[in-house]
Every structure is written in C-alpha cells, then in structure tokens.
Amino acid sequence: MKQLFYLFASLLMLIPSACGLELCAQEADSLIVISKEDMTLRLIDGQGGDILKFPIACGKNYGNKRKSGDMKTPEGVFSISEIVDASYWTHDFGDGKGEIAGAYGPFFIRLETPGHRGIGIHGTHKPESIGTRDTEGCIRLHNEDLCHLVEYVRVGMTVVITPSYKDALAGQ
C-alpha cells in the first residue's frame, strides 16, 4: 500500500504535461508542492531545489476533497487564480465565537480547484494550529511565512498537493 502511495505521488508530478497545463507557469522556473504527509509547503525552483519550505496546517479529515464542507484538502495539480489582500476578512468557525477578524491572515492565494470553491493558501489567527490537521480544506501558513511566499508566487503558478499515506487509505 505504501508503494502505491509513493507511485501516486510520483505520478502527480507528471500530470501537468499530460493535461496540457504549463508545469511551472509561463517562465517554467518554479512551482509549489504541498505534502499532506510531511505537512509542508515547498517552493521549488526549475532544477528541483527548495527556494522556501514552510510548515502547514491542512484539512481536518483525511482523504481527497469530494464536496463542500467535508473538511478535506483537495489533492492533485492546481494553479493560482488570484492573490488577494485578506487582512480585513473574517470567518465564523461555528464554535460560538462568531466572526473572527484576521482568520485568513494578510493574504489569500486562491487556487483554481475544479468542482470546489474557496480553496487556497492563507495565514491564520491561530498559529498553534500549524503542523496539525485543523482547516476546513485550505492550506494554512504562519502569517510571516505567507508574507514571504507572496513575494515569489504569481497567478498561473502550478500548485501540486500530494496525499499522506492515511489520505490514500481514506480514498479506498
């Protein structure tokens, strides 16, 4: 089973060319790889080396996102559709505390995720959640890491999200 997971993760790297997507956007120089196994986001250069590496939080539930509200992070190859100022955004987590200011941190990097709306990479008001499965499906970073990442990313950049071993098992 573990071999199947690693085969799947390796094949994900080939999907952009098979689907006609540009592997590394227009300049073919970098992409983002998010590992739900290692709980990391890596910005990788055109030669495969790390430019940046940050810890993340991802969806509370294991498996690939199937529907809105399932608390799962989607897996596959996506692209950045927009980068927006989220510093004024609020969110109600349904915990009785109401709308929380700063819930998304300073930016929201929206991903083009067919079939799912509102999935992206963003900051947090809850830094202790980084390294855990605590989101509704988005990828969460420390705010300072997000600010650093935003300096390097652009609309159209490829984002690959790979499953953990438990995510792969949850899909069976």
Locate predicted features.
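Positively charged n-region of N-terminal signal peptides that target proteins for export
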Residues: 1-4
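Short beta-strand segments
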Residues: 52-54, 78, 117-119
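Bacterial N-terminal signal peptides
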Residues: 7-17
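Structural motif
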Residues: 38-40, 77, 108, 118
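Generic structural signal for buried aliphatic residues
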Residues: 78-79, 159
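Intrinsically disordered, low-complexity
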Residues: 21-68, 75, 161-172
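Exported/periplasmic cell-wall-interacting domains
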Residues: 26-27, 68-71, 86-172
